[in-house]
Amino acid sequence: MTEIYDFDKSAWDIKGSIAPTQPTTHSEGRLVPQVRVIDPGPGDRKDECLMYMSLLGVVEDSDPLGPPIGRAFGSPPLGVGRSTAKPEELLKEATELDIVVRRTAGLNEKLVFYNNTPLTLPTPWRKVPTTGSVFNANQVCNAVNLTPLDTPQRFRVVYTSITRLSDNGHYTVPRRMLEFRSVNAVAFNLLATLRIDKAIGHGKIIDNAEQLPEATFMVHIGNFRRKKSEVYSADHCKMEIEKMGLVFALGGIGGTSPHIRSTGKMSKTLHAQLGFKKTLCYPLMDINEDLNRLLWRSRCKIARIQAVLQPSVPQEFRIYDDVIINDDQGLFKALQTVVPSNA
């Protein structure tokens, strides 16, 4: 049985939107570099805030003899750093990087990024570009299938996205708890609806936000579980959620990221599941990579957030990684697989 409750829009009115990156071009047709700065927090950090930086650009042929052929868009994250440099200075330095791209494979297709030029301003982010980084290709590239192996590839930075982490605390991505399942527990999930302006280009912005197309994603927050064998009622869970005083915002961690802050009282069990943190971040890069790629340059705004209460998936259910095939007596048998939609 699934129960759904709507949050009031005041919970995301202040920082529940991200401005678009509108492309402009030089006279010869090349994109003009731009920087986008996002601050999803309340700004209560007293010292200089940390910044999370991502790059967005074009994967193209590295051919010095002819005009480069663009193959795909890419967006590798550089991670968190502390810097007093202006965003425009960081953008200029990023566009001067000579980043090599190589396609490879492991459990899934990968893209390797590494830089061949010395870094000056982006020193806090030195490790990722200089030592090289390997990413799940579908998380950082919109068309890895078009990236050739027989032609050297480079990554030309066009945009940078900077997310100021101005909260007086720590952001936590509770990865270890996202697949946690428990008997007689109620899973607390959030279903978020975004309005997206997918039209990119001059004069194509839709003024009426109500007309924008919508997309949804779901994140798992935690489980409500009693010590006894009984299960909490949906009304009790709703009361616990209301006590938490949740506030929502959109940031740019790993592309686009919902940020959740609890301003009220949280149950001890749920607080422990979240690592005793009240400021959470769920990068869409990990949750919904297809939607994340769509939002790389788009304007988006939270239209609706709902609390979804569902029974926790039984531990006996097998997930995709547990598929077993045996050929005893010449017969192939695959165990029935259930992919849980919540933890």
Curated annotation (Swiss-Prot):
Name of a matching Pfam family: Matrix_Paramyxo_C
Domain of life: Viruses
Subcellular localization, as worded in the UniProt entry: Virion; Host cell membrane
Primary location group: virion
GO annotation, biological process: virion assembly
GO cellular component term of the entry, any: host cell plasma membrane
Record InterPro entries: Matrix_C, Matrix_N, Matrix_Paramyxo_C, Matrix_Paramyxo_N
Keyword Membrane: yes
Molecular function GO labels: lipid binding; structural constituent of virion
Alphabetical UniProt keywords: Host cell membrane, Host membrane, Host-virus interaction, Lipid-binding, Membrane, Viral envelope protein, Viral matrix protein, Virion
Family the entry assigns: Belongs to the morbillivirus/respirovirus/rubulavirus M protein family.
Quaternary assembly: Homodimer. Dimerization is critical for virion formation. Interacts with host ANP32B.
Function of the molecule: The M protein has a crucial role in virus assembly and interacts with the RNP complex as well as with the viral membrane. Associates with phosphatidylserine (PS) and phosphatidylinositol 4,5-bisphosphate (PIP2) at the plasma membrane. Interaction with PIP2 triggers matrix protein lattice polymerization. Matrix proteins induce host membrane deformation and curvature necessary for virion assembly/budding.
Annotated protein name in UniProt: Matrix protein
Organism field: Measles virus (strain Biken) (MeV)
